[in-house]
Amino acid sequence: NQYVLRLDNSKQMIDQHSEKSTKQLWDLNDGLPKWPKTPSLLASSFVLHWLDNPQGQLQEWFNSLSSEGCIALAIPIKGSFPEWYQAAEQANLTCTALELPTHDSLIRVVPNQNILYNKIEIIKQTAAKATSLLKPMIKVGAHSSHEEQLSISDWRHLLSFWPIHNKDKQVSLSWSIQFLLIKR
């Protein structure tokens, strides 16, 4: 009697799943929905960092699991986007990237013996222009930030400082992704 429920606060993201999928529109900042049965698996890819208080949310998710339940998590963490931060600093502008949780702040909320897997991977994307790397982030709302947005002229100024890292004159955008498998 197990099934997969796809949960998101974005109707656009929910609508990307098959019509046959079980889906629920839900704002995870309000906590998890009240389900008739406690979940045996919570899987989250690039969601937790959008939420207010990701650490508190992770602790709630852990506490909501059934006995022997698991959380599988992929989340960008602090240390992501060094190129963006470098360009902003050199352009004397505020980096408007979303502030991400630290590796330690996430694992601190779960007992160490319950962490089955904990690894950080650096993923580097390259393109001819930084805008090609940033536009897909904007498409999924990843440009959201607590910082005041830059004007178009400020963006142009920032992009002129984006570091070029290879002989092909390509630019990069690097992500630090934490992968966690947690068992209750």
Task: Kindly label every feature range from the protein language model.
Residues 40-55, 75:
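A short SAM/SAH-binding and catalytic strip from SAM-dependent methyltransferases
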Residues 68-130, 143-153:
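Conserved catalytic/acceptor-binding region of the Class I
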